[in-house]
């Protein structure tokens, strides 16, 4: 028996695991004192074993989980024992990895051994896979005599700290850097937001269109690029996350190939960034041939990163290939935020805004140049007339006439400029400031045209507040009152609710609104149009036979013009008992280049009122956005005194 015991001596391999800067070694060495009656197994086979020395080093990242392959034999033979002096103890750490509490013994002579199977112990996961040793595996293998004789008790590992384990099971999430944004103070930004609000409420399209900024472009694009980067990193790191269980081969060529692959594995370092347990290859029970099922989440196999060998097994042993990936642990190798792309995209956004701003400036310059050319042409005509007068009339008679004519023209121009923008005196300024002070909001400040203006209504003219219906109706009535003066066209202005009622309820709902008014007897009809959050103006000019739509945001609304033309037809039949002659009538919508445009989201009501003011005086529309603060103060004084300046 001593000879048999000497031949049965076996020294198991040593598996080294490098994880979180800690080294755990597993020495699978049986204890001595095996009974003689248990040495004879089925068919009294005495199997010679070959010592397989496997030294695999797996380098794991801080956020990656690691696994420790444990190798043992299902069919131990009588020559797989050591002397009584080589006593080995085994311990199991908290995460399911096996270690040896005693130093490994020196290498012994290698012997051939048949039917040796290698199994992979994996850490217990949430899917129900548990760490099982000594014959109990996930594939329901039977318990061998060797395992019954040499049970291995788990021993808690003091070297495996709880904090390290917690760092593996629940790694700290990477804190994303918050992106700071600059507050937009440019008027074009407010104008763009206001234009988008109008499109949402009215469903109309406006001529000046800019890229929408509901969600910042640089953030959405960076998120999409981060997703692509994450996919690439998972693709690269996933290829190095597989472990294999290699069964022993009875032939010498199979054993040699296993040793060759083991030597290659001993010099390889694998990066396991993230894993989830997933079986990617199964061994046939009879033939041991590897079958590779295709999964939608599996990654392609790279032979440079992982060495694998297809082996055959005898009896009921099976070869299992496991691919382990962790879907819950994020990979730190790829950044979720690329600063360079963000800077480029942010720069492109601001470049587009700058180009839009420059385009608007060019349009305003072109409009100013056009007005200047018109004035120069008028001056040229006046100079031409004066030259002809000099040629016809003697010089001594021409001098006083010319001087009188020039003086009259200069005086007329000064009067026009003073009428268009009269100066607000200090007394007027004090009165206006007094109105804007805090007081009783229901206090009546002005009353006329069967309308009452309170302090609350006047507050809509302060700063950038939106004008309400009472202010606009009161101002339109003042325009009607001024039209009674000599030399001005007669005007009738409809209520601010007229067009909305006409559009929604039809002519029958508004035909009594003109019971005491003959709309065909005036020169101009003013129709304020409210689009929910925006004020516009429609003008019916019976002298020129046209209906024109004015929008300070550049909107086109030919539908409103058609509704008003249809109203004139029905009004003529109802009041005049005859059809309205539409021959020669034209419908227009003023473009943004033809009339002044608002540069914020607050002055649409002021623009509509000032459009009506210029049209009812037969004056060109020559104001701009810069005049709006002046017009607001001026309108306060005009409403308080019920008189236009």
Swiss-Prot record:
- Bias (Low complexity) occurs at 99-117
Region span, Interaction with CCAR2: 1-200
Motif residue range(s): Nuclear localization signal: 171-177, 575-578, 629-635
> What Gene3D superfamilies is this protein classified in?
Adenoviral Proteinase, Chain A
Does Isomerase appear among the keywords? no
Motif Nuclear export signal covers 636-645
Per the record's keyword annotation, is Magnesium included, yes or no?
A: no
Q: Which residues carry this modification: Phosphoserine?
A: 57, 117, 157
Region: Protease; residue ranges are: 451-614, 451-615
Instruction: Cite the EC number.
Output: 3.4.22.-
Q: Name one GO biological process term.
A: protein desumoylation
Active site annotation, chain numbering: 534, 551, 604 (nucleophile)
Any single GO molecular-function term of the entry would be:
SUMO-specific endopeptidase activity
- Subunit and interaction comment: Interacts with RBM33; promoting ALKBH5 desumoylation and subsequent activation.
Record-stated family: Belongs to the peptidase C48 family.
- Protein name in the entry: Sentrin-specific protease 1
Which gene underlies this protein?
SENP1
């Amino acid at each position: 028996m001593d000879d048999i015991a000497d031949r049965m001596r076996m020294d198991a391999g040593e598996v080294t695991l490098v994880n979180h800067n800690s080294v755990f070694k597993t020495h699978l060495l049986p204890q001595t004192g095996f009974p003689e009656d248990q040495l004879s197994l089925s068919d009294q086979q005495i199997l010679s074993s070959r010592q397989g020395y496997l030294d695999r080093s797996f380098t794991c990242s801080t956020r990656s989980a690691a696994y420790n392959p444990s190798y043992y034999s299902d069919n131990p033979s009588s020559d797989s024992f050591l002397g009584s002096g080589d006593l080995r103890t085994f311990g199991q750490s908290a995460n399911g990895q096996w270690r040896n509490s005693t130093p490994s013994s020196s290498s012994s002579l290698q012997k051939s051994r048949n039917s040796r199977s290698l199994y992979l112990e994996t850490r217990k996961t949430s899917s129900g896979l548990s760490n099982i040793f000594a014959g109990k595996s996930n594939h329901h293998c039977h318990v061998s005599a060797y395992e019954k004789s040499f049970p291995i008790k788990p021993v808690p590992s003091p070297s495996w700290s709880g904090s390290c384990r917690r760092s593996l099971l629940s790694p700290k999430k990477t804190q994303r850097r918050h992106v700071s944004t600059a507050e937009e103070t440019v008027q074009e930004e407010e104008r763009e937001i206001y234009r988008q609000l109008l499109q949402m409420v009215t469903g109309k399209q406006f001529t000046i269109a800019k890229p929408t900024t509901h969600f910042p472009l640089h953030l959405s694009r960076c998120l999409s690029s981060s997703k692509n980067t994450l996919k690439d990193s998972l693709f690269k790191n996933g290829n190095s996350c597989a472990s294999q269980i290699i069964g022993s081969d009875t032939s010498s060529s199979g054993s040699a190939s296993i040793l060759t692959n083991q030597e290659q594995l001993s010099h390889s370092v694998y990066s396991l960034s993230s894993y989830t347990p997933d079986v990617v290859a199964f061994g046939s029970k009879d033939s041991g041939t590897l079958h590779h099922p295709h999964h939608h989440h599996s990654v392609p196999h790279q032979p440079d990163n992982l060495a694998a060998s297809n082996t055959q097994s005898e009896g009921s042993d099976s070869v299992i290939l496991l691919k382990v990936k962790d879907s819950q642990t994020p990979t730190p190798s790829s950044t979720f935020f690329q600063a360079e792309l963000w800077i480029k995209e942010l720069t492109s956004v601001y470049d587009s805004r700058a180009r839009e701003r420059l385009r608007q400036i060019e349009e305003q310059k072109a409009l100013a140049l056009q007005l200047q050319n018109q004035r120069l042409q008028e001056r040229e005509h006046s100079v031409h007339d004066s030259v002809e007068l000099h040629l016809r009339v003697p010089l001594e008679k021409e001098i006083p006439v010319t001087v009188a004519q020039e003086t009259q023209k200069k005086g007329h121009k000064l009067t026009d400029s003073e009428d268009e923008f009269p100066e607000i005196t200090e007394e007027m300024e004090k009165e206006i400031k007094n109105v804007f002070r805090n007081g009783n909001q229901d206090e009546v400040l002005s009353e006329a045209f069967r309308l009452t203006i309170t302090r609350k209504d006047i507050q809509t003219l302060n700063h950038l507040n939106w004008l309400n219906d009472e202010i606009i109706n009161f101002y339109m009535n003042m325009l009607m009152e001024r039209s009674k003066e000599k030399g001005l066209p007669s005007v009738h202005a409809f209520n601010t609710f007229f067009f909305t009622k006409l559009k929604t309820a039809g002519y029958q709902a508004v035909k009594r609104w003109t019971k005491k008014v003959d709309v065909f007897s005036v020169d101009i009809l003013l129709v304020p149009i409210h689009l929910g959050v925006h004020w516009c103006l429609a003008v019916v000019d019976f002298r020129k036979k046209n209906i024109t739509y004015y929008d300070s945001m550049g909107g086109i609304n030919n539908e409103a013009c058609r509704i008003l033309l249809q109203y004139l037809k029905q009004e003529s039949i109802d009041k005049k008992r005859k059809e309205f002659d539409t021959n020669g009538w034209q419908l227009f919508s003023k473009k943004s280049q033809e009339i002044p445009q608002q540069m914020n989201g607050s002055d649409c009501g002021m623009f509509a009122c000032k459009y009506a003011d210029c049209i009812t005086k037969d004056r060109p529309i020559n104001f701009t956005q810069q005049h709006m603060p002046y017009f607001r103060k001026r309108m306060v004084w005009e409403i308080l005194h019920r008189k236009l300046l």
